[in-house]
Amino acid sequence: MAHKKAGGSTRNGRDSEAKRLGVKMYGGQVIKAGNIIVRQRGTQFHAGYGVGMGKDHTLFAKIEGVIKFEVKGAFGRRYVSVVAA
């Protein structure tokens, strides 16, 4: 009898779609108001002057200018600011 018993199914075989997080615009670049600077989970980067934060912690420019990344404070927090050009 050349028969083969059916194999069981696996519980693996799934993978989530990439979320495309990260820094979208870098220091020294000119940016327009409303453009996204960083997409992140939590506050890896904090909003400085001229930068707003969305409900998913996305940082975006509130004014037109040049992006500036800086580390400030006793905790070494990373801030993103937009300096008017």
From Swiss-Prot:
Keyword Transmembrane helix assigned: no
Listed GO MF terms: structural constituent of ribosome
Pfam families per record: Ribosomal_L27
Biological processes annotated in GO: translation
Keyword terms, alphabetized: Ribonucleoprotein, Ribosomal protein
Record's GO cellular component terms: cytosolic large ribosomal subunit
Nucleotide-binding is among the record's keywords: no
Family that this chain belongs to: Belongs to the bacterial ribosomal protein bL27 family.
UniProt-recorded name of the protein: Large ribosomal subunit protein bL27
The organism's taxonomic lineage, starting at the top: Bacteria, Pseudomonadati, Pseudomonadota, Gammaproteobacteria, Pseudomonadales
